[in-house]
Each structure stands twice: as structure tokens, then as C-alpha cells.
């Protein structure tokens, strides 16, 4: 960047003007203005997973059952500057560090990919909080050099709510208890 150099001071100005594209715009508690948490300067490659999708890392992973025993992860990845000569690789890694599945996709602004999951271990809250890791990488298709990567931990589970019987996780009725609490500072 022409504006930021290592070793120089960076001044930040905060604007607390209402913005309808950012939730929440109204609330039952006081909004504080300004910067009241740490600020980090992040250096990223030109071709990367987006960092500007409303606070997300630009990668959305949805587990779903396929047939009786099969599962798959549906992946949607948002890419900045996708016109580079790179590719994306998505790898499913189990809790022991073993690679279970992998796929490679051409780079474009929105990538859709699927990863099959054989013999899955289902996430089951406190009983079995088993998590897989989905390693998401952008790499140079010529040199194989990884230029951006994000590891996302995710669980495989299905749930539904019955208006008479309550909440079900992986086919088992679960009694939910909780509190209403928010953090504003």
C-alpha cells in the first residue's frame, strides 16, 4: 500500500453513524461509539478468501445427510481477486489429524464445492463434541505454493424442532435450557 509502511504510526478514525447494512441498528441497550477493543493490521495476499463478508472469513460450510448413512459438506467460499492463476483446495481432516477427503476447484469469485464424509462421527454437544477440520487453501497452480489458508472446525449434526415435542439433535430429543444475555462492552 502507498499509505501504510512498517514502523510508521497509523491513526484510525471511527464513525458511529447509523448504517442499515450492519445489524443491529436499534437495541434495548446503549450503543458505545469509538474503538474499544484491540485493532490489528493484517497483511494478506492479493488473491485470498474474502475478509469483508460481514465479519465472516468468507467460507460457509453446511453439513447434510445424504442417503441413509452418508454425509457431505457443502462449501461456499468467497474469493477476492479471483482472476489470478491459482486454485482452491478443501480438505476434510478428522480429530486425529487424518485426511478423509479432498477436492480442488478453479478460482472464481464464488466457489461451490462438496466433500463426502464416509463413516462420520456425529457431533453431539457435551456427550460427544467431535469436530472435524476443513482446511481451505488457495495455492499457485504452477508452483503448488499455498498463498492463503484457513482452518475451520466443524461438526456433523442434524437437528429439527417439533412444536409439541421440542428440540431433536441427531434424532434424539434434547431438553434445552439457557439464559438471555448479551455483551456490549
Model-derived features: where do they sit?
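Secreted/periplasmic carbohydrate-active enzymes, especially glycoside hydrolases
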Residues: 1-185
Amino acid at each position: 500500500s502507498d499509505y501504510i509502511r512498517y514502523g510508521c504510526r497509523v491513526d484510525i478514525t471511527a464513525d458511529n453513524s447509523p448504517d442499515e447494512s450492519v445489524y443491529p441498528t436499534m437495541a434495548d441497550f446503549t450503543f458505545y461509539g469509538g474503538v474499544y477493543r484491540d485493532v490489528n493490521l493484517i497483511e494478506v495476499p492479493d488473491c485470498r478468501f474474502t475478509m469483508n463478508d460481514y465479519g465472516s472469513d468468507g467460507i460457509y460450510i453446511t453439513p447434510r445427510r445424504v442417503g441413509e448413512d452418508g454425509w457431505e459438506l457443502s462449501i461456499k467460499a468467497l474469493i477476492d481477486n479471483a482472476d489470478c492463476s491459482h486454485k482452491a483446495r478443501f480438505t476434510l481432516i478428522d480429530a486425529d489429524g487424518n485426511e478423509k477427503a479432498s477436492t480442488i476447484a478453479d478460482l472464481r469469485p464464488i466457489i461451490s464445492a462438496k466433500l463426502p464424509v464416509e463413516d462420520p462421527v456425529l457431533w453431539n454437544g457435551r456427550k460427544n463434541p467431535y469436530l472435524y477440520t476443513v482446511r481451505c487453501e488457495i495455492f499457485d497452480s504452477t508452483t503448488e505454493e499455498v498463498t492463503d489458508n484457513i482452518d475451520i472446525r466443524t461438526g456433523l449434526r442434524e437437528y429439527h424442532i417439533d412444536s409439541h415435542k421440542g428440540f431433536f439433535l441427531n434424532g434424539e430429543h434434547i431438553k434445552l435450557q439457557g439464559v438471555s444475555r448479551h455483551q456490549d462492552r
